[in-house]
Amino acid sequence: RVAEIARAFGMTVLIAERVGQAPRSADYTAFDEVLANADILTLHCPLSPETTHLINHDTIAKMAKRPLLINVARGGVVDSQAVVDAIHQGKLLGYASDVFEQEPMATDDPLMTLATYPRVLFTPHNAWGSANAQRKLWSILAQQVSSFILNHE
């Protein structure tokens, strides 16, 4: 959905392939190429051994355009200290996240030092908790329970 909204604003969207993998189709771009060309980089991947600290000092060094980095994946996908260093060094335009390596965010998390920066935004990871999202969740649950009961009578 992020790509759809970005395209509506006239943005060119690059979808990254997994690190080290050749693009599987024309819709995918090599990870390093995305890093080199992104003005805005949003993260939407699961946390796994392959994605832990996916964004780190080395990957930030490959970012040629000083992008805005948005992490809505998992906290561990981003190396907090690398982000802090990049903000201080002007390598990132800004940083936004609703996820942290430890939740709630630890008081000694390096990201806490950015809390008052003008281009840094931290929000709680609870978009699922809106009234509409909860109604939809309960509706889906009711449908699944009903289907289970009807199919097992």
Can you describe what each PLM-predicted range is?
Residues 1-65:
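Rossmann-like dinucleotide/phosphate-binding beta-alpha-beta segment
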Residues 48, 71-72:
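A generic structural signal for short
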Residues 66, 72-153:
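Rossmann-like dinucleotide-binding domain for NAD(H)/NADP(H)
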